[in-house]
A protein has these predicted regions:
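N-terminal, polar/charged subdomain of small-to-medium soluble alpha/beta proteins
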Residues: 1-46, 55-58, 62-66, 70, ...
Length: 92
């Protein structure tokens, strides 16, 4: 993901992140693949509405992870994501 965010002064910055969704079975992965476009869109808009400072605040990392899992699970009907793991998370 590349997400543009504004800081408190209104300056544009970019969040560049790569993550994996943790599932408990293959069928969950298949359901995620079926809904990938809307899931990606929802994640993008979740991250986009945050300020740049909030995104980089380590104290909010666990809350953001839980929020993202909740967001993903809103689009899944049969199976659920268990966690999200950030492989890369860079703010510029």
């Amino acid at each position: 993901f590349w997400v543009e965010n504004k800081d408190v002064d209104g300056h544009s910055h970019f969040l560049i992140c790569i993550f994996s969704i943790v599932c408990d079975n293959v069928q969950a992965e298949q359901e995620i693949d079926q809904h990938l476009l809307v899931i990606r869109d929802a994640i993008y808009f979740y991250l986009r509405q945050k300020t740049f400072e909030a995104i980089l605040d380590a104290k909010q990392a666990e809350t953001m992870k839980k929020d993202l899992v909740y967001t993903i699970n809103n689009y899944l009907t049969r199976y659920k994501a268990k966690d999200i793991l950030f492989e890369s998370y860079i703010g510029q």
